Swiss-Prot record:
Biological processes annotated in GO: DNA replication initiation; double-strand break repair via break-induced replication; mitotic DNA replication preinitiation complex assembly
CDD domains in the record: RecQL4_SLD2_NTD
UniProt keyword annotations, A-Z: Cell cycle, Cytoplasm, DNA replication, Nucleus
Primary location class: cytoplasm
Recorded superkingdom: Eukaryota
Paired cysteines (S-S): none
GO molecular function: DNA replication origin binding; single-stranded DNA binding
Compositional bias (Polar residues): 47-71
UniProt cross-references to InterPro entries, sorted A to Z: DNA_rep_checkpnt_protein (IPR021110), Sld2 (IPR040203)
The keyword Transport belongs to this UniProt entry's keyword annotation: no
This protein's name: DNA replication regulator SLD2
Length: 354
């Protein structure tokens, strides 16, 4: 049976089962019907066998019957191709391979240290015509040369290294000394060991002992009391100078509230001194007072008569003559005149307006 026929039979049974029971068939329903169960298993086995087989056959490309002419090989072209990046024989170079030149060297091969055969090759023979045309030159191999004077070394050792050196001599200075003096001197060209204790730097025991004795004598002659007194005097002088400097500096006045009233400078009242009765003649003083009283009485008596005479004269004069005009005395004359145009008063008024 073909797979299509098996599938159609299974579908027909499923539609019939759905019409009867109003549901799709389950596994138990399929197992109950033996024929349908066999069809399901057969369909499954056929489908699984088809999947294992290759779906498409591999096509074999047969070579074409067209004959092509062979390409001639160019032996002169280099085998190693250079790309856009730096390469050597087709291989990309790194930073460390830049010293190599591409055609001769590669990062895998190292050049042998042996000399190349071209080094042992004979130089080309010179033509006789060329030798005749050339101008004669001075021979470089000089037979006689003036002797060079033996020079000393220009640089000198610094002073801080001279202390640690125990008469080291350079080869040149050693040779010069041999020429001047026949005495044999050892060629000492090695600096002394830095770890070795050097006796020349330290002091001798005698020097240390003498310095200790001097210090002991200085301590005996040294008076502590005198030193303390001199020190205290210096401190007292310093304190005096500081206090004097402080006094010279004027204290800074604090800012206070501005005036709200005008300042007036008034003279002080005279002090009432009690009259002293010493050296005073009381009788003369009493007589003067009595005479003054008499004069006042006489003047009072005479004033009544004068008033009567004046009234009669004024009445006659008022008929014929106009009364005399008197200038009016202002009240401000009784007070002290104000200094209105004083510049100080202007400043005061300006401050009061604020």
């Amino acid at each position: 049976m073909d797979i299509v026929e098996i599938k159609s039979k299974i579908k027909e049974w499923e539609y019939a089962f759905r019409k009867q029971h109003n549901k799709l068939p389950s596994k138990a329903d399929i197992k109950d019907d033996v024929e349908i169960h066999k069809l399901y298993s057969l369909y499954k086995s056929i489908k699984s066998g088809q999947q294992q087989k290759p779906s498409k056959q591999e096509t074999v490309n047969e070579p074409a019957s067209v004959q092509s002419s062979p390409v001639k090989r160019n032996d002169y072209s280099p085998r190693g191709e250079l790309g856009p990046t730096p390469q050597a024989n087709g291989r990309v170079l790194s930073i460390f391979d830049l010293k190599m030149t591409p055609p001769d060297s590669s990062p895998l091969k190292h050049k042998s240290d042996k000399a190349s055969p071209s080094a042992f090759a004979m130089p080309p023979p010179q033509s006789p015509v060329k030798n005749i045309i050339e101008t004669p030159t001075k021979s470089k191999n000089k037979s006689f040369v003036t002797p060079i004077k033996g020079r000393k070394i220009v640089f000198e050792t610094p002073s801080y290294l001279n202390k640690h050196r125990q008469n080291p001599q350079t080869p040149d200075s050693h040779n010069n000394n041999n020429n001047n003096n026949n005495n044999t001197v050892i060629n000492f060209s090695v600096s002394p060991s830095p770890f070795k204790t050097q006796r020349s730097i330290g002091k001798r025991l005698t020097e240390v002992y003498n310095t200790s004795l001097k210090e002991a004598e200085d301590l005996k002659s040294f008076n502590l009391e005198e030193e303390f007194q001199s020190h205290e005097e210096q401190e007292s002088e310093e304190t005096e100078t500081t206090t004097n400097n402080d006094r010279k500096i004027a204290p800074r006045s604090k800012r206070t509230q501005k005036r709200s009233t005008r300042r007036v400078k008034m003279a002080p009242r005279p002090v009432n001194s009690k009259p002293s009765l010493e050296n005073v003649n009381l009788q003369d003083h009493i007589t003067k007072l009595e005479e003054g009283e008499r004069k006042q009485l006489v003047a009072y008596m005479d004033s009544d008569e004068d008033d009567e005479n004046r009234d009669g004269e004024v009445g006659i004069a008022s008929v014929f003559e106009s009364p005399t005009k008197k200038t009016r005395m202002p009240v401000s004359n009784n007070f002290k005149r104000l200094k209105i145009n004083d510049p100080r008063s202007r400043r005061f008024k300006q401050r009061m307006r604020r």
